[in-house]
Amino acid sequence: MGADLSGQDLQEVQISYCNLDQANLADAKLIQASIQHTTLNNANLHGADFTNSDTYNISFNHADLTDAIFTGSLLQRASFDGANITGADFSSTLIQPVRQRLKLCDVASGVNPTTGVVTRDSLGCW
């Protein structure tokens, strides 16, 4: 198992070149965080709040992102292969490359219990 940072207030934290694979960040507050060149593969991010965060080259592969909030975030070169995004809110989030957003639309479902936003709607899925 990875680090246990569940429920932690990590607002405005700066994380670079970290391996947080299998970490528990459930319900962590990562509001306005800057996260770069970091892996969160197989991590528990259930209910984590990434509002207005700036990420670059980050991997969420096979992570649990259920009910996570990414509102207003910038997700550049983010990878979500096999991630569970049920109930996640991506409203006003810039996801690059665009093909990543399209891949997320293929698996998007649910409604975020905090914001009340439908995941597919927040991604702009057709």
Predicted features and spans:
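Tandem repeat scaffolds
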Residues: 1-126
